């Protein structure tokens, strides 16, 4: 992040706006809505500001200094906005405010600002702020317009009523997890629908009954085994997104991308359970035991795995353990690396003219060899997808050639598929190992073998910056 988003309490505090035009008038109106006392400094005022002055000055909320800006105007200010049409004046205001360590915003000049103003979706007490860091105000405005259509106006009333009952709910339920689950059920159920329909009294009566009838039973834990997909956050399923937001704790793998981890709730504890070749941070048996222990503590456990949990993800072993302990679980499929990486590389895994079948195998080296059914893999008219095949690539290609595939059979390797770091190298079984070594590829990678690889040249649509020079 280039800027830290914060919400500043300026209620009954003095804020200074320098400028007397329409832009200044909009800034004054926003500050007044936030409860500030505003002092406007300008030689002249536009009609809109004059109207605001007539309305607000009697209440002591708005004051006017018919002067050019002087440093003394900042004497008791907690925030300053420079909205004049004179760059030199705006620069002087910025320098004075920074010297006094007062937050300053200069309209349309991020370089002079110590803070910038976001676009705001106001559903008080719910407020959503959107910013591009000054890079594209138009994009920010478009995002705000979209959010305005997605968030009903009644969300403000919904939040206000929840605030009225907050202390009672806290007193009713001693455990934070119980309170959170109560509110999740209430805010997604009949209470919310009644508020949206304008039936506020009925909604409050319903909530009263729920509080009276709710029992403080021990919280039951459960485990969500969720596929995070190959890396691009936009490939997550809606169900995965929902469970990511309601989990009490997350146990995640090495292949879950940082961008996806950023979509978790900030307050959710995270436990890393990644595995790398010859270095397992946590053995599989320990992971199984950890899931059981966390669930028995009453937690909703998100087991987040790269790709799909049932395709070389050892998800079956984990839920067997959970089932053996009587722990509830659910499985959310993810887009597996084969589907995601191949699609983003422009390589269809099946094609009427080239491949009538597709085989997924794992290419882990063990004692210098890869233990696979080579005669089956060397059949024509099929596509072979090899997970975790980077280190064993030379053995893989030699064995396929030795068992009957032509040495010029098309083959490709995809690094970090579906992400901005994706790199694709298309070659043949004979040349791919040497080209891969020269390119210094790193895991995670996916190897694809078969005639469909030739379609990559025509169908490659995803071209992130920094792709391999000369790669196809």
UniProtKB/Swiss-Prot annotation:
Family annotation (PROSITE patterns): SUMT_2
Keyword Lyase: yes
Keyword terms: Cobalamin biosynthesis, Lyase, Methyltransferase, Multifunctional enzyme, NAD, Oxidoreductase, Phosphoprotein, Porphyrin biosynthesis, S-adenosyl-L-methionine, Transferase
Positions where Phosphoserine occurs in the chain: 132
Gene3D superfamilies: Cobalt-precorrin-4 Transmethylase, Domain 1 (3.40.1010.10), Methyltransferase, Cobalt-precorrin-4 Transmethylase, Domain 2 (3.30.950.10), NAD(P)-binding Rossmann-like Domain (3.40.50.720), Sirohaem synthase, dimerisation domain (1.10.8.210), Siroheme synthase, domain 2 (3.30.160.110)
Source domain of life: Bacteria
UniProt-recorded Gene Ontology molecular function terms: NAD binding; precorrin-2 dehydrogenase activity; sirohydrochlorin ferrochelatase activity; uroporphyrin-III C-methyltransferase activity
Pathway: Cofactor biosynthesis; adenosylcobalamin biosynthesis; precorrin-2 from uroporphyrinogen III: step 1/1; Cofactor biosynthesis; adenosylcobalamin biosynthesis; sirohydrochlorin from precorrin-2: step 1/1; Porphyrin-containing compound metabolism; siroheme biosynthesis; precorrin-2 from uroporphyrinogen III: step 1/1; Porphyrin-containing compound metabolism; siroheme biosynthesis; siroheme from sirohydrochlorin: step 1/1
Keyword field contains rRNA-binding: no
Example GO BP: methylation
Reactions accelerated catalytically: uroporphyrinogen III + 2 S-adenosyl-L-methionine = precorrin-2 + 2 S-adenosyl-L-homocysteine + H(+); precorrin-2 + NAD(+) = sirohydrochlorin + NADH + 2 H(+); siroheme + 2 H(+) = sirohydrochlorin + Fe(2+)
Annotated active site: 253, 275
CDD domains: SUMT
NCBIfam families the record matches: cobA_cysG_Cterm (TIGR01469), cysG_Nterm (TIGR01470), PRK06136.1 (NF004790), PRK10637.1 (NF007922)
Function: Then it catalyzes the NAD-dependent ring dehydrogenation of precorrin-2 to yield sirohydrochlorin. Finally, it catalyzes the ferrochelation of sirohydrochlorin to yield siroheme.
UniProt family annotation: In the N-terminal section; belongs to the precorrin-2 dehydrogenase / sirohydrochlorin ferrochelatase family.
Record-linked PANTHER family: SIROHEME SYNTHASE (PTHR45790:SF1), SIROHEME SYNTHASE-RELATED (PTHR45790)
Protein name per Swiss-Prot or TrEMBL: Siroheme synthase
């Amino acid at each position: 992040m280039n800027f830290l988003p914060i919400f500043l309490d300026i209620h009954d505090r003095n804020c200074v706006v320098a400028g007397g035009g329409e832009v200044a008038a909009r800034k004054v109106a926003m500050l007044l809505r936030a409860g500030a006392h505003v002092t406007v400094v300008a030689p002249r005022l536009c009609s809109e500001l004059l109207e605001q002055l007539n309305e607000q000055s009697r209440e002591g909320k708005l004051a006017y200094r018919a002067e050019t800006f002087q440093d003394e105007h900042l004497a008791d200010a907690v925030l300053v906005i420079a909205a004049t049409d004179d760059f030199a004046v705006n620069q002087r205001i910025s320098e004075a405010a920074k010297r006094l360590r007062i937050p300053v915003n200069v309209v349309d000049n991020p370089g002079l600002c110590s803070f910038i103003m976001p676009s705001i979706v106001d559903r008080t007490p719910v407020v959503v702020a959107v910013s591009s860091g000054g890079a594209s105000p138009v994009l920010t405005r478009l995002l705000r317009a979209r959010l305005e259509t997605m968030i009903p106006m009644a969300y403000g009333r919904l939040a206000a009523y929840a605030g009225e009952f907050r202390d009672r709910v806290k007193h009713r339920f001693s455990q934070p997890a119980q309170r959170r689950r109560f509110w999740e059920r209430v805010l997604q159920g009949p209470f919310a629908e009644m508020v949206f329909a304008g039936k506020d009294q009925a909604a409050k009566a319903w909530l009263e009954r729920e509080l009276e009838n709710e029992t403080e039973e021990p919280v039951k834990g459960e485990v969500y085994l969720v596929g995070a997909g190959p890396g691009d956050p936009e490939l997550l399923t809606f169900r995965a997104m929902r469970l990511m937001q309601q989990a009490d704790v997350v146990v995640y793998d090495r292949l879950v991308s940082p961008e996806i981890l950023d979509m978790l709730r900030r307050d959710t504890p995270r436990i890393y359970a990644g595995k790398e070749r010859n270095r397992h941070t946590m053995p599989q048996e320990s992971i199984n035991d950890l899931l059981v222990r966390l669930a028995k503590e009453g937690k909703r456990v998100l087991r987040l795995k790269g790709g799909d949990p049932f395709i070389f993800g050892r998800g079956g072993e984990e839920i067997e353990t959970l089932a053996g302990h009587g722990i509830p679980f659910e499985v959310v499929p993810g887009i597996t690396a084969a589907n995601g990486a191949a699609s983003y590389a422009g390589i269809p895994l099946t094609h009427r003219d080239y491949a009538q079948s597709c085989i997924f195998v794992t290419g882990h080296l063990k004692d210098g060899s890869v233990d696979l059914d080579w005669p089956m893999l060397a059949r024509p008219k099929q596509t072979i997808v090899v997970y975790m095949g980077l280190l064993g690539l030379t053995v893989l290609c030699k064995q396929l050639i030795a068992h009957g595939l032509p040495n010029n059979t098309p083959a490709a390797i995809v690094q970090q598929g579906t992400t901005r770091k994706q790199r694709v190298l298309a070659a043949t079984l004979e040349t791919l190992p040497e080209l891969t070594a020269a390119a210094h590829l790193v895991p995670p990678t996916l190897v694809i073998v078969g005639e469909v690889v030739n379609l990559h040249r025509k169908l490659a649509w995803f071209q992130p910056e920094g792709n391999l020079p000369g790669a196809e």
